[in-house]
Amino acid sequence: VQTGPVVDATTLGASPTIYLNDWRFHIGDAPDANGTGTPSWARPDFDDSQWPVITTDKRLADQGFKQGFPGFCWYRIRIQVPAHANLSVYLADVLSTYQIFEDGVKVGQYGGLPPHERRLETTARAYPVPSLSQPGTIVVVVRVWAHPVQSPPGIEPDSSYVGHSAAIANLRRVYLLDQFHHEIQEIVHAGIDLVMGAVLLFVFLGQRRQREWLWLGLAFLADSVASAVSELQVF
């Protein structure tokens, strides 16, 4: 039994994308999630009627969920699609790794989930929606995991859309361009810290009694290394 939410993508026209805001939501993981088949919670015929409906434009803590819960959570939504449509689902800021299923088929994964955890910087991705010969409904499911230091996991505001594939590609392009500009700024910042740290250590070598130059130089170098390590997680 599925009672919603339902997004009507058959009305796409003047607005080439629709924000996926209302989802069925559940904390925890499917009991068969690490098996060889499709997890039961990812199947289109799974009864999600007892799952609460949440909105991604609000913090989970503001919707009755405790802050700081670690581990897994699941999102489910139904999308009505027209026949022979060229549509895609867009996911951007999802903390921190996830799998996405469309009608029970795993169509993508970002990062690594337990038992093979691999956390990455968030980024935007597009997942094509299956083309149907007749108008119908597909079920999109997102399984999300976050390390306890990053909890709570979940889909951030303004990070989930469905729409014409060309419009979704443009939305992703804009996100990646903004992300690129941010990364350039971080690299420049790391470079400045590196230079400052080296200069301060050089000054310390000439004034060994002034140990504040040593500590300040090491602080700049540490900040530079931390920024560099963070940027290496982006792809």
What role is predicted for each listed range?
Residues 59-65, 75-76, 122-128:
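Short structured motifs
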Residues 48, 82-84, 131-137:
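A short, structured loop/turn motif at beta-sheet edges
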Residues 1-63, 78, 139-177, 197, ...:
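Accessory carbohydrate-binding/adhesion or oligomerization-edge regions at the termini
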Residues 164-188, 228-235:
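Alpha-helical transmembrane segments and their interfaces in multipass membrane proteins
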Residues 189-204, 211-235:
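Hydrophobic alpha-helical transmembrane segments of multi-pass membrane proteins
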Residues 51, 79-102, 140-142:
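Aromatic-lined ligand-binding clefts that engage carbohydrates, nucleic acids, or primary amines
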